[in-house]
């Protein structure tokens, strides 16, 4: 007699294959995430006077500012350039992450409630 909520004799063949495929996909995703975390993404703003670098962990690792961009009378402009460069670097990181996940999932964007 089957256990309540289970299948007689264990999982059907297709379900077993599906589980193996899901486990393989999970391993690949973990490997890709580890690779991504070791990468850096840089972006510039203001014609290159501000450069921001973020890691695959989405942490700012470096900010370079050309001294000519520092105007004590216009600090707001420098702040805007830093924000713009940071957002662009984060966008590059996100694009790379999505591209890697698409390779693994084969474009199953809705799988898992949109986790990918």
Swiss-Prot record:
Its GO CC terms are:
bacterial nucleoid; cytosol
Keywords linked to the UniProt accession: Cytoplasm, DNA-binding
Highest taxon listed in the record's lineage: Bacteria
Q: Name one Pfam family in it.
A: YbaB_DNA_bd
Q: Where is the composition biased (Low complexity)?
A: 13-26
Q: Where in the cell is it found?
A: Cytoplasm, Nucleoid
Q: Where is this region: Disordered?
A: 1-42
Mind telling me which SUPFAM superfamilies this protein's record contains?
Answer: YbaB-like
In this chain, composition skew of type Gly residues spans: 1-12
Molecular functions (GO terms): DNA binding
What is known about its subunit structure? Homodimer.
Function comment: Binds to DNA and alters its conformation. May be involved in regulation of gene expression, nucleoid organization and DNA protection.
**Protein family per UniProt:** Belongs to the YbaB/EbfC family.
Which NCBIfam families does the entry mention? DNA_YbaB_EbfC
Return the protein name: Nucleoid-associated protein EUBELI_02017
The scientific name of the source species is Lachnospira eligens (strain ATCC 27750 / DSM 3376 / VPI C15-48 / C15-B4)
